[in-house]
Amino acid sequence: MSDRQQVTNARGERIAIVSGLRTPFAKQATAFHGVSALDMGKMVVNELLARSELDPKEIEQLVYGQVVQMPAAPNIAREIVLGTGMNVSTDAYSVTRACATSFQSTVNVAESIMTGNLDIGIAGGADSSSVLPIGVSKKLAHALVDLNKARSLGQRLSIFRRLGLKDLLPVPPAVAEYSTGLSMGQTAEQMAKTYNISRADQDALAHRSHTLATETWNAGKLAEEVMVAHVPPYKAFIDRDNNIRENSKLESYAKLRPAFDRKHGSVTAANSTPLTDGASAVLLMSEGRAKALGYTPIGYIKSYAFTAIDVWEDMLMGPSYATPLALKRAGMELEDLTLIEMHEAFAAQTLANMQMFGSKKFAEEKLGRNRAIGEIDMSKFNVLGGSLAYGHPFAATGTRLVTQVCHELKRRGGGTGLATACAAGGLGAAMIVEVE
């Protein structure tokens, strides 16, 4: 059996990324305060369709993701279909793979095209850290169920007497891993210690990310892939990511205290991604349908891979496991790539993965390879800045990475690019795209 992955349909047509779009990304409780992930998802899909000048009823499938899900609308994909003028018979379902969610939605639509079930689909993801499912304590939840069954006033009073004042307090969404109790920041701190990553190196990477993102915006490179978002009640709009430190100075990073290990830590708010609101989407077609409709795709999917590792130790190493698998399936080596886009959840996590890309010992012990994945050429790496600057709406990041690398490859005359990310639960994702 060949190791090569055939990302084509039965007619031998490649999977075309026709276009991609995102909202600006905004820090929690700023420009998108009060705007749900669903509303942002509808916003970006509507605009994607408008820019493509494609009849919404031509969309055969929409797969969309959300990490912080709202109980009122658990199938965000279907609600987007119903809210954007698509045919009501359009297939739609939702996925979640933590920070790799929109990698998953993209692959799901691609695989539907590969099997011949459809020719046109939309994938993406959205998350809001400003509109959250605030819950109740387990004791209060239990009592509320019992109250619904109570038949008399005496029974109701008996149930209320079981509750204390602390049981009535609202419960925000958990920030820790369910299985380990560790937050992502604590895991990043763990990785900084495991791989001896200094505070200075973390701060330097964050400064690089913000500096490059500022230059990218100022050069007008993101105009095609970031929409202007008009926010209810439509008296204001946002047209640029608002997390970027446009006057980033390296020396200012050293002033912040560690956020997760106050005494001995090195992970700070400045070298981590903030809680972010935003949405993104890509329009996918079979190569034949794209050409028949007159589109020039921004790229094609060459290969992809998903991996999983243990969650108890350094679980944000996903890129180091998924990337070599995606490269193998594409018949490539790291040095063959024109560009590399790696999700920067934390500077520590990013630097740990970069270090392991070049480690022969890691390759032998963890990957069963006789050579390292390869040393990363920084002239190819996150050349427009990364998540540390742009922000990280969990489910939206994957399609941001894919769209961004495709557009940059276009500007450079084509080539191949890697988009890769770690994700909670020890998950990893990688996708290789080719651009003509």
From Swiss-Prot:
One Pfam family it belongs to: Thiolase_N
Record EC number: 2.3.1.16
Coiled-coil ranges from the UniProt annotation: none
Keyword Transferase: yes
InterPro entries assigned to the protein according to its UniProt record, in alphabetical order: Ac-CoA_C-AcTrfase_FadI, Thiolase, Thiolase-like, Thiolase_AS, Thiolase_C, Thiolase_CS, Thiolase_N
PROSITE patterns, sorted: THIOLASE_2, THIOLASE_3
Family designation: Belongs to the thiolase-like superfamily. Thiolase family.
PANTHER family (UniProt xref): ACETYL-COA ACETYLTRANSFERASE, CYTOSOLIC, ACETYL-COA C-ACYLTRANSFERASE
Protein name: 3-ketoacyl-CoA thiolase
Taxonomic source organism: Shewanella pealeana (strain ATCC 700345 / ANG-SQ1)
Taxonomic placement: Bacteria, Pseudomonadati, Pseudomonadota, Gammaproteobacteria, Alteromonadales
